[in-house]
Design a protein with these regions (language model features):
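Anionic-ligand binding patches
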Residues: 2-4, 10-187
Length: 187
């Protein structure tokens, strides 16, 4: 069975493939013939943005996700704006730099990642989610992962997502948790 993922982000696709491959064949939106469709994420929540990503695509199973990093000391920012925290011309590095600047004098470093996966199957749309709690580091650590991974240490661990192997990260990450709930929903 094919799962079309409404993304061309190779990091996300790699994580998803590692977690569901063997049971399902994962295709990016471009591989499925939808490369010219670029939904605008203008929702006010992760749930809305995840659904926006899947609505224009068709297939046996279509999924789209949105993820946010919610920092307690910043009243939940960057939250739904995590991917564009440093502005429309921002990137992962600029987003991390902005977050570290804003956290410079903060003692409360608690944060959590939340991933919402929207699923379209047989005309039905539903969402599942996964949360990973942890804390923000004072500087970037590690070379793996993407996004805020070098700044986030999950609860119960002493290293950032970027310092973990893919297997370690997938076992505890927000996206890994959401994907496991998604796979269970198919069975």
């Amino acid at each position: 069975m094919n799962i079309i993922v409404s993304t061309d982000n190779q990091h996300k696709l790699k994580e998803i493939r590692e977690l569901v491959e063997g049971k399902y064949h994962v295709l990016s939106k471009t591989e499925a013939g939808f490369g010219n469709i670029h939904p605008i994420e203008n929702g006010d929540s992760l749930e809305e943005n995840a659904v926006i990503k899947i609505k224009p695509l068709e297939g046996e199973i279509v999924i789209g996700d949105d993820t946010g990093l919610f920092v307690h000391a910043l009243d939940g920012r960057p939250g739904v704006y995590s991917a564009r925290y440093a502005g429309e011309d921002g990137n992962d590095e600029k987003n991390r730099e902005k977050l570290l600047r804003e956290m410079k004098d903060k003692t409360d470093r608690r944060a959590y990642f939340k991933t919402v996966i929207a699923v379209k199957r047989g005309g039905e749309i539903y969402t599942v989610d996964g949360i990973c709690r942890g804390k923000i580091t004072e500087s970037a650590k590690g070379d793996g992962g993407f996004g805020y991974d070098p700044l986030f240490i999950p609860e119960g661990y002493s290293k950032t997502f970027a310092e973990m192997t893919d297997q370690e990260k997938n076992a505890v990450s927000h996206r890994g948790r959401a994907l496991r709930v998604f796979v269970e929903s198919l069975e």
